[in-house]
Amino acid sequence: MSFDVPDDLRYLESHEWVRVAGDTAEVGITAFAQDELGDVVFVELPDEGTELTAGEDFGVVESIKAVSDVYAPVSGTVTAVNDRLRDEPELLNEDPFGDGWMLTVEVDDKSETDDLLSPDAYRDQIE
């Protein structure tokens, strides 16, 4: 099965994605991750203002099959949280790269994204 891997994103081996624009990064889980999880029934995210550390967990995604931690691709301060996921966790399944975004972060050090997987490297990992 082939999964969508947008070329404008960077990826973690743990199946999170990050879209960096200036000093802001939007974060979510990949199409592969949501498929592996199955139907998502609950999402726990941090509050705005929370400090994230790259590689550390920041939330939980619960599906009918599993409970999984979600990891920060970059360090920084949470500036927005997708509150729709509290009432509509299925957005992670329906649109993981769009309406299913999880949070935005004011990035402390953009060079951290240099260590993340390129789209091609992530494709190689999930094939």
Swiss-Prot record:
Cysteine disulfide partners in this protein: none
Protein name: Probable glycine cleavage system H protein
Record keywords: Lipoyl
Record note on cofactor: Binds 1 lipoyl cofactor covalently.
NCBIfam families for the chain: gcvH, PRK01202.1
Gene Ontology biological-process annotations: glycine decarboxylation via glycine cleavage system
A cellular component term, taken from the record's GO annotations: cytoplasm
SUBUNIT field: The glycine cleavage system is composed of four proteins: P, T, L and H.
Sequence ranges assigned to domain Lipoyl-binding in this UniProt record: 24-106
InterPro entries: 2-oxoA_DH_lipoyl-BS, Biotin_lipoyl, GCV_H, GCV_H/Fam206, GCV_H_sub, Single_hybrid_motif
Stated role: The glycine cleavage system catalyzes the degradation of glycine. The H protein shuttles the methylamine group of glycine from the P protein to the T protein.
The encoding gene: gcvH
Similarity comment: family membership: Belongs to the GcvH family.
Co-factor requirement: (R)-lipoate
Residue(s) carrying N6-lipoyllysine: K65
